[in-house]
């Protein structure tokens, strides 16, 4: 296990339809607030778009969205919702340079193996244009490992996430927030939100 976890991808492949059916159609309010930071028509890369709920709302607000997911079955569901191509791409396959005004990763990077995060975060930084924004949410409060559904979580602490992002590139700002919430199957979870802005030059 280095840059991706096969059992976790397998879970989402097998459970794609069931997982999407549990997801409300409303956009995550944390993302809605983040989008207010962006200029109209901003080019957004979404990593781990799932069934495409957040992408649909971003598109409805006039943003130029590039939705991606590492699981083909998820991408297919998102394509039906969005009526557009959804690329099948794992986090470690991101190789674009200075192409996006924002990179959104809502409850997706939390499945990336900790050892693979430095390279992934560096790729995200590289994909952003100068002054671009990055939004990500993670689960926190436990040691990295698998949940009862067989999904891997890196469970980063605020300090760990901040150190990893700082090492990934030159950021103008990196801000965090934590709150109690729920995850899949309405299981209690502590969430960590990260918003960073790439340096202007």
Model-derived features: positions:
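Class I SAM-dependent methyltransferase SAM/SAH-binding core
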Residues: 51-93
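A short acidic, Gly/Pro-enriched loop at the edge of an enzyme's catalytic core
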Residues: 93-103
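A short glycine-rich, Lys/Arg-flanked "PGG" loop and its adjoining helix->strand segment in the class I
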Residues: 118-130
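Conserved beta-strand signature within the Rossmann-like core of class I S-adenosyl-L-methionine
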Residues: 131-138
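Conserved S-adenosyl-L-methionine
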Residues: 170-182
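Acceptor-substrate binding/catalytic loop of class I
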Residues: 145-160, 184
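Conserved class I S-adenosyl-L-methionine
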Residues: 1-39, 41-50, 142
């Amino acid at each position: 296990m280095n840059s991706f976890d096969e059992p976790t991808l397998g879970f989402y492949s097998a459970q794609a339809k069931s997982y999407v059916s549990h997801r409300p159609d409303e956009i995550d309010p944390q993302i809605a607030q983040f989008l207010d930071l962006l200029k109209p028509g901003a080019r957004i890369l979404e990593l781990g778009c799932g069934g495409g709920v957040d992408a649909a709302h971003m598109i409805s607000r006039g943003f130029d969205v590039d939705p991606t997911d590492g699981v083909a079955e998820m991408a297919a569901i998102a394509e039906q919702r969005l009526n557009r191509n959804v690329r099948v791409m794992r986090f470690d396959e991101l190789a674009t340079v200075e192409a996006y005004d924002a990179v959104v990763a809502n409850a997706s990077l939390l499945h990336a193996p900790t050892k693979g995060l430095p390279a992934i975060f560096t790729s995200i930084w590289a994909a952003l244009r100068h002054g671009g924004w990055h939004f990500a949410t993670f689960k926190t409060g436990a040691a990295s490992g698998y949940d009862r559904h067989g999904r891997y979580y890196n469970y980063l602490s605020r300090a760990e996430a901040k150190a990893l992002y700082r090492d990934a590139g030159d950021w103008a700002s990196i801000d965090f927030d934590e709150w109690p919430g729920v995850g899949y199957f309405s299981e209690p979870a502590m969430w960590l939100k990260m918003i960073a802005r790439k340096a202007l030059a």
